[in-house]
Amino acid sequence: MRTIYLIRHGKPEFPDEQKYCIGRTDLPLSEEGRTQIRALGETFAGRRIEKIYTSPLKRCRESAAILQEVIDRSIPIEVMDGLAEIDMGEWDGHSFDEIREQFPAEYAARGADMYDFRPPQGESFADCARRARTTWNELRMKSRGDILVIGHAGWFRTLICGWEKRKKAELLQIPFGYGQVYEKKDFVFDALISAAGRSSRMGDFKPLMKLGTQTVLEREIQTLRACGVHEITIITGRRAEDIRAAAVGTGIHFIHNPAYAETKMFDSVCLGLSYYKEKRKTAGKETLDGIFFFPVDVPLFTPFTLEYEKYRFAEGDGDVYLPEYEKTPGHPLLIRADVIEKLLQHDGTMGLKGACEQPEIRRIPLDVPDPGCAFDADTQEEFQKLRDWERKRPIPDREECERLLAWFHTPEATVRHSRAVAELTVELADRVLKHRSETYVEMTYKSPPIDKHKIYAAALLHDIAKAYPEHPETGAGWLRLLGHTGIADIVADHMDLPEEKLGYLNESLIVYLADKQVQGERRVTIEERFAAKREKFKDNPEALAGVERRYQLAKRAEALL
């Protein structure tokens, strides 16, 4: 395991003693800031740092240069634009007194919704968080050892807020002073794909068959990359050159099994494991913690399965993690790198399954809510089933929704509420569709299609993460990882509908409104729903203001129906 050090730049040179909004304002370090960073650099003496990544802003680049000079001048520095601080738009460079005076309405709106508020021509913290997650994954995959990341408090806080499962409202409470360090432990995972089979029963070449617009192999590589897998090793056999040509991109390694026609899959697996054994020996054990393994004909596992395996891997209770869907074995396996040598000592009986069942190997079966992990294809008929499932996956059916509610241990009261909301969404949708048919409304962006199956599924799962902080976005995140992309945004919107979706009838608005009209399992009016909350927060002016804001939004949505 390696450590990634998040380091806030030193104190900048401010124009005066006022408090300024300096998101992208390019201030240099102050003398105090340079002293802070130099002292920090001394604490890294003797540590092996592979690389320094820095924001393009001057205060960070200067901090990075000082750290390089103090720690080791041979450490490379890379500037990443994605590390830049949150863009405060027209507010940038102004004092907060000036902002309050020039933008009174916007400043008040910011106070009511700090996380999602977007200053004129700028970013919200939600925008910054999305950019931060993308950049974080990029920089993680650029290196394998300990690294320094020099950046900004706002950018770092959006990541830490998610890592520590904090509420959005707590974002600015996360301490991150000038020159402060946050240590993030990080496992390094690679992947091994066995693509040396002959595809004899398929009558085609499985790695290069199309699933939608992508080949099987392209889909698998995309999923691995989305989960921060570093190097992908592909064992080739038949049509090796075609696979090399198709698997484009950095961090892809090929090992050819010249005897693929006479050997079994375990022989190909051993070629890959032997490669990783030698790699750890030369580069150091800390450069590789685990290996995802799967045969190339299992392309529909989702990022959720990989992330869940990584989560369980971090608990340290197993050596091989084996996903399964409703008792059906699936892929990828996650193999702890420390047991590579033991697996290689196996005599080959029962292949990799037999190697993993050695008594010294701790096997951990993992039930996952991902049918795709258990779908493989050896014939054209089986491959067509993969295509059918891939087409249907964005919108889960009722049976799959109920399975998800059970897997995530959603409380029974919440499940009953969700079913009641789902039934109401269908009634509201029928009302909208009936009105459209009677008035011959043309489909436009202001009157988009209403899919009853989609809103029913979204309503059934809207509170799937109710027991977790920021449950709308948490639940939507789970659904995106599972490939249920058709309903994820609706789930994310169900508590606070974005302003841009309040001007016309749409699927998010219908689910949002149905949720506001069901209390427990009982249907209520908007007024009834908010009366209890007004009473609850009557002595808390700030919370009461939030209740009133949500009430007004709900009434605007109701007026559209």
Protein language model annotation of sequence segments:
Residues 39-107:
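Phosphate-coordination/substrate-recognition cap region in phosphate-metabolizing enzymes
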Residues 166-186:
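Domain-level recognition of soluble alpha/beta enzyme cores
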Residues 190-237:
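N-terminal glycine-rich phosphate-binding loop and ensuing alpha1 helix
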Residues 261-341:
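Conserved beta-loop-beta/alpha segment of the NTase-like Rossmann-fold superfamily
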Residues 341, 347-399:
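Conserved alpha/beta core of the MobA/IspD/sugar-nucleotide pyrophosphorylase nucleotidyltransferase superfamily
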Residues 388-471, 481, 522:
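Acidic/His-rich, divalent-metal-binding segments that scaffold phosphate/diphosphate chemistry
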Residues 444-537:
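Divalent metal-dependent catalytic cores for phosphoryl transfer on phosphate-bearing substrates
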